[in-house]
Regions:
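Acetyl-CoA-dependent GNAT
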Residues: 2-61, 101, 120, 133
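Conserved active-site tyrosine of GNAT-family acetyltransferases
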Residues: 17, 107, 112
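Conserved catalytic-core motifs of GNAT/GCN5-like acyltransferases
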Residues: 95-97, 113-129
Length: 134
């Protein structure tokens, strides 16, 4: 029997695992396309979105705006860019999830509909699952 080791993962390990999962999923979920973008200000990344589509659905994995840059429309700009490009490529909907300490109100203002809410999820926090038709 081969020896196995159970080890904590580094960021590099996590990237490899994520890459392998995406590669595996592509066998079943065709037309995979990345819609990830970032915004730089004075040479520093201050906002970014990590999103990808498969078949006719765009999934937003992460949307982040530096605290000092919030309220300037950067999140809206990133989300609309991903939505518009995905729509042009034939996507029909967007899926995402967020937590009560993040931005559920932002997604509602952006036209997202609540699919499900888990209360509580992590301690006192709730988790929200949203969708939007494109």
């Amino acid at each position: 029997m081969q020896e196995i080791e159970l080890l904590p993962s580094s960021e590099q390990d996590n990237r490899y695992i994520h890459q392998q999962l995406r590669q595996y999923n592509r066998q079943f979920m065709r037309d995979f396309k990345d819609y990830s973008f970032h915004i730089k200000q004075d040479g520093q990344i201050v906002a970014g979105i990590v999103a990808a589509s498969t078949m006719d659905t765009l999934e937003v994995e992460f949307l982040f705006v530096e605290e000092s840059c919030r309220g300037q429309g950067l999140g809206r700009l990133l989300l609309e860019q991903a939505e518009n490009l995905a729509r042009q490529d034939g996507c029909k909907r967007v899926l995402l999830n967020t937590y009560s300490f993040q931005a559920p109100g932002f997604y509602r203002r952006m036209g997202y509909e609540l699919l499900a809410q888990q209360n509580p999820c992590f301690g006192e926090y709730s988790q929200y699952y949203f969708t939007k038709n494109l």
